[in-house]
Design a protein with these regions (language model features):
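Beta/alpha (TIM)-barrel catalytic core signal, keyed to glycine-rich beta->alpha loops juxtaposed to Asp/Glu
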Residues: 1-178, 193-200
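Secretory-pathway/luminal and periplasmic proteins that interact with or process carbohydrate-rich
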Residues: 141-142, 182-186
Length: 200
């Protein structure tokens, strides 16, 4: 357990030596963000954030706004949930991390799919994909939020990039906000052993 100040100090030395350009953190909590930032300004924080997982809004995003730190949400498509490609009968292979995540166990997945139905209403009205709605919603939150959706297929990359052209109006954003808040996410983010490694 190395104090975060020591980590930040080492990164500061690397930046001053020209070996590193910026200091980023991942899955850090508010206390560690503040402590690290006091030693070496943090450029960006990476953590999960999407219509499916809005926990960073409670404490993380206000601190990032206060300190001028960018936010890089991973899993902005809710690990595939927000693409509309999953069903209650979806089975995940042994190499798929979702096979280990409580949110994607059969009962939890069935309950969590209620959010997809609500997002689909906006997608159909706008003539775009569910994934584009989810990414456009993130892009509309703050100019310093830059999601990093992952894909292995060119057509999905092109679809994801298309989200930058989507304009969600105030009514769309309010509808998505209400939809997201109306569905209580079932299942923990990670199994207990993995969850303990996260700084919050």
């Amino acid at each position: 357990d190395v104090p975060i100040e020591d980590v930040a100090g080492t990164v500061k030395e690397l930046i001053e030596a020209g070996k590193v350009r910026h200091f980023g953190m991942s899955e850090a909590g508010v206390d560690n963000i503040r402590r690290a930032h006091a030693v070496q300004p943090v450029t960006a924080l990476q953590s999960e954030y999407s219509l499916f997982w809005r926990e960073p809004e409670d404490r993380i995003l206000p601190v990032l706004a206060e300190l001028g730190i960018g936010f890089v949400p991973f899993s902005p498509l809710g690990r595939g949930l927000l693409t509309g490609q999953l069903t209650a009968g979806t089975e995940f292979g042994a190499g798929d991390i979702r096979a280990t995540l409580p949110r994607f166990e059969a009962d939890a997945l069935r309950a969590n799919l209620a959010l997809v139905d609500l997002v689909r209403e906006v997608a159909e009205r706008k003539g775009i994909t569910l994934g584009q709605v989810a990414l456009a919603w993130l892009l509309a939150q703050q100019p310093w939020i830059v999601p990093i959706p992952g894909t292995r297929r060119l057509e999905r990359l092109e679809e994801n990039l298309g989200a930058a052209e989507v304009e969600l109006g105030p009514d769309d954003l309010a509808e998505l906000d209400d939809a997201s808040r109306s569905v209580q996410v079932q299942g923990e983010r990670y199994p207990e052993a993995m969850q303990q490694m996260i700084d919050r």
